[in-house]
Amino acid sequence: MTVPVRGFSLLRGRLGRAPALGRSTAPSVRAPGEPGSAFRGFRSSGVRHEAIIISGTEMAKHIQKEIQRGVESWVSLGNRRPHLSIILVGDNPASHTYVRNKIRAASAVGICSELILKPKDVSQEELLDVTDQLNMDPRVSGILVQLPLPDHVDERTICNGIAPEKDVDGFHIINIGRLCLDQHSLIPATASAVWEIIKRTGIQTFGKNVVVAGRSKNVGMPIAMLLHTDGEHERPGGDATVTIAHRYTPKEQLKIHTQLADIIIVAAGIPKLITSDMVKEGAAVIDVGINYVHDPVTGKTKLVGDVDFEAVKKKAGFITPVPGGVGPMTVAMLLKNTLLAAKKIIY
């Protein structure tokens, strides 16, 4: 049996009827822990009037096991073990934390990695020299430059300095262009994470209304491209009707759109941008936001998303937490891209 949530099941009801993704039929999604469950990464309080909380941490563990099997199968055939090179500039604590997590995750799935540290005053030319060397190194499968970069370095120039076939962040102009043309490409990891959450959870997209709050070229735009494009193209999309909001969208206008949305994806970097009155009953809410705010209770800094989680979870059908939602999935999709790059499946 499927899990009823506020008057509809995981596969039928307010989020629509099967087929689920594109024009294909979604696998059955059962209650957490039920035999035959498509994915067991949901956490539910057992109170049916609250949203199903999608654990990106648990889903990422499942994907990393898939990647680990893929890596070992690839190596067992006599191929070179995938190798990820990470370039980190400066001493931003958050960037160092993100990189440590990526290196740890790579090791867990059997991917070799190396960290190339550069001071914050490194020149753009020196960074391009580093990417050139890595591009030509046959042992390197994937390259990423941890963002943000110092103000004197143009991020787009550096991202385009990475060979498209090794661009595991998916930021090169060729990968972005192929994504926009519905062709196979190395997809930006955060956008891929959101898409994977939607697919594996069984959330319907075909013909549905989606709001993406945030239009960055690395996150918001790729998410919108994945969701609105044709499900029968070379790189299938979600066949959804997508509205993109941004910093100049008036709050009341945003509210009009979100109240009609079956799926709300928030990547604006504004704490509590999405409140419960902006969400319709049973909508799926995916929070990509990363914000550090002062916690008046503990007196410490805490990580929150862009959604008023405690209030919205009482109204939504699905919701991702921060932390523990899109973040772990982004790392998993980065590792998946590294394996794809090593196997030269795209290029």
UniProtKB/Swiss-Prot annotation:
Residues that coordinate or bind NAD(+): 214-216, 247
Its annotated pathway? One-carbon metabolism; tetrahydrofolate interconversion
Which reaction is catalysed here? (6R)-5,10-methylene-5,6,7,8-tetrahydrofolate + NAD(+) = (6R)-5,10-methenyltetrahydrofolate + NADH; (6R)-5,10-methenyltetrahydrofolate + H2O = (6R)-10-formyltetrahydrofolate + H(+); (6R)-5,10-methylene-5,6,7,8-tetrahydrofolate + NADP(+) = (6R)-5,10-methenyltetrahydrofolate + NADPH
Membrane topology of this protein: Peripheral membrane protein
Gene Ontology biological process? 10-formyltetrahydrofolate metabolic process; amino acid biosynthetic process; folic acid metabolic process; purine nucleotide biosynthetic process; tetrahydrofolate interconversion
**Transmembrane as UniProt keyword:** no
Listed A to Z, the keywords are: Amino-acid biosynthesis, Histidine biosynthesis, Hydrolase, Magnesium, Membrane, Methionine biosynthesis, Mitochondrion, Mitochondrion inner membrane, Multifunctional enzyme, NAD, One-carbon metabolism, Oxidoreductase, Purine biosynthesis
Gene Ontology CC terms: mitochondrial inner membrane; mitochondrial matrix; mitochondrion
Pfam families per UniProt:
THF_DHG_CYH, THF_DHG_CYH_C
Query: PROSITE patterns, per this entry?
Result: THF_DHG_CYH_2
The subcellular location is: Mitochondrion inner membrane
Indicate whether Ubl conjugation appears among the record's keywords: no
Q: Where does substrate bind?
A: 98-102, 145-147, 323-327
What EC numbers are recorded for this enzyme? 1.5.1.15, 1.5.1.5, 3.5.4.9
Which Gene3D superfamilies does this UniProt record tie to the protein? Leucine Dehydrogenase, chain A, domain 1, NAD(P)-binding Rossmann-like Domain
Primary place of residence?
Answer: mitochondrion
Summed up, the tissue specificity of this protein is: Isoform 1, isoform 4 and isoform 5 are expressed in brain and placenta.
* Cofactor(s), names only, from the UniProt record: Mg(2+)
Q: Where are the transmembrane segments?
A: none
Output one GO MF annotation: methenyltetrahydrofolate cyclohydrolase activity
Task: Indicate the family of this protein.
Answer: Belongs to the tetrahydrofolate dehydrogenase/cyclohydrolase family.
Function summary: Bifunctional mitochondrial folate-interconverting enzyme that has both NAD/NADP-dependent methylenetetrahydrofolate dehydrogenase and methenyltetrahydrofolate cyclohydrolase activities.
PANTHER family from the UniProt entry: BIFUNCTIONAL METHYLENETETRAHYDROFOLATE DEHYDROGENASE_CYCLOHYDROLASE 2, MITOCHONDRIAL, C-1-TETRAHYDROFOLATE SYNTHASE, CYTOPLASMIC-RELATED
This chain belongs to which protein, by name? Bifunctional methylenetetrahydrofolate dehydrogenase/cyclohydrolase 2, mitochondrial
Which organism does this sequence originate in? Homo sapiens
Q: What is the lineage of its organism?
A: Eukaryota, Metazoa, Chordata, Craniata, Vertebrata
